[in-house]
Amino acid sequence: PMTTLRTRSWDNPDDVQTPDKTHAASIKLGAVTLTKANAQPGWKWSECIKPHVGTESCQAGHIGVLLQGKIHVVSDDGSEVTINAGEAYRLAPGHDAWVVGDEPAVNLEFSTDSKEFAAWTRGES
């Protein structure tokens, strides 16, 4: 029988993506994928990720928690939010985002098999 208790180490992720100023490692736990991303100072979605995905803004949704640093997000509709370390967040598709200040931003995001929730994927629904 399959065990109901399971752990995984970030030392052995299922996937690693390293676009400009970014290191993102993903671990699958059943139907849920956890992605731990480290964005360096100077990281901005529209400069570091946009060239790889070809959309005007990030078209992925995100649910996660910022573990370290600070990120500013501007939605396509003009609304803005700053995410601080320790805060959980949900971002709808259609936004740009960047690291604020000189500290790397480290976040942990959650997704399911039914939808992509990552800045480094196309995020198509």
Task: Report residues per predicted region.
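A short, N-terminal "cap"/entry segment at the start of jelly-roll beta-barrel domains
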Residues: P1-Q40, S46-E47, R122-S125
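Short, acidic/polar N-cap/turn motifs at the starts of alpha helices
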Residues: T22-A24, L34, G61, K70, ...
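Conserved GNAT-family N-acetyltransferase fold
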Residues: A37-A39, G64, Y89
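Short beta-strand segments in beta-sandwich/barrel cores
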Residues: K44-W45, G69-V74, A97
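Short acidic-glycine-tyrosine-enriched beta hairpin
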Residues: S75-G94
